[in-house]
Curated annotation (Swiss-Prot):
GO terms for molecular function: carboxyl- or carbamoyltransferase activity; S-adenosyl-L-methionine binding. S-adenosyl-L-methionine binds at Y58, G83, C84, S85, D108, N109, D136, I137, N151, R218. This is Carboxy-S-adenosyl-L-methionine synthase. Pfam families: Methyltransf_25. Catalyzes the conversion of S-adenosyl-L-methionine (SAM) to carboxy-S-adenosyl-L-methionine (Cx-SAM).
């Protein structure tokens, strides 16, 4: 029987489904030939542990996405979680939606992530329905949206596709709607960038990752995860049409922006 959604948001991050997450040891031993990063079955299996030990402030962002949903989700609207992975942001939003007639659409292009996401969503009962969709987020037609989440997703798109996606998000939002855009940042000030890069590595070491694990994962990600500066993100958001865009959370070189579409909520 599905559980009622009564556990805390922090617990949802540690246990996003009916079983506890496995510890990430994917890169603990030397890998002879490192390919590019993919969100495959092995990554999906350890993803909750991996992201909590790798992304500073991740659990805070997830919790606060729920708080933002309570504030911004409008009655009879749709909410999109684009690049939903295992559904942590979806669960956080669903728990905090207080208005009627809403639906969350959670999208990811990884079959392994989608399969587990469906299990995690189905493990908890709630009033707000969720559609879990396996698709390229660029192919999703956004409509009647009051809130959209891109939680560490945009950085995995080809740079040439990023503006197009943000344009689609803006067009699909209702007046008064919000986009939450969480990303790893790079910095125009090289000294600050180096400091925060090193602090992030200290964070991973403190969470039990070895130098080998850190190095191998970085090598696999370097051609796949292409980061932007906060200034670049803001420029894109304003170009898409968002009247307001600002960082609302940051820890080291990771953070989240909120972008607002002007107008009165309907």
């Amino acid at each position: 029987m599905p559980k009622r959604e009564t556990q805390s948001l922090h617990d949802t991050q540690q246990q996003p489904g009916p079983t506890a997450p496995q510890r990430d040891s994917l890169f603990a031993a030397p890998i002879a030939k490192l390919g590019d990063w993919t969100f495959d079955e092995k990554v999906a299996e350890v993803f909750p542990d991996m992201i909590s030990r790798s992304v500073p402030g991740y659990s805070n962002i997830i919790s606060m996405i729920g708080m933002l949903a309570e504030r911004f989700v409008q009655p009879n609207s749709q909410i999109y979680d684009l690049g939903c992975s295992l559904g942590a942001a979806t669960l956080s939003m669903r728990r905090n939606i207080k208005v009627e007639g809403c639906k969350i659409i959670a999208v990811d292009n990884s079959p392994a992530m989608i399969e587990r996401c469906r299990r995690h969503i189905d493990a908890f009962r709630a009033e707000t329905p969720v559609d879990v969709v396996e698709s390229d987020i660029l192919d999703i037609q956004l409509e009647n949206a009051s809130m959209v989440v891109l939680n560490f997703t945009l950085q995995f798109l080809e740079p040439a596709d990023r503006q197009r996606l943000l344009n689609q998000v803006y067009q699909g939002l209702r007046p008064g709607g919000a986009l939450v855009l969480s990303e790893k940042f790079n910095f125009e000030d090289n000294d600050v960038g180096e400091l925060l890069f090193n602090m992030h590595h200290d964070f991973k070491r403190a969470n039990g990752y070895s130098e080998l694990e850190i190095s191998q994962k970085r090598s696999m990600l370097e051609n796949v995860m292409l980061t932007d500066s906060v200034e670049t993100h803001k420029k894109r958001l304003h170009q898409a049409g968002f009247e307001h865009a600002e960082v609302w959370f940051q820890c080291f070189n990771f953070g989240s922006l909120i972008a607002l579409k002007a107008g009165e909520a309907q």
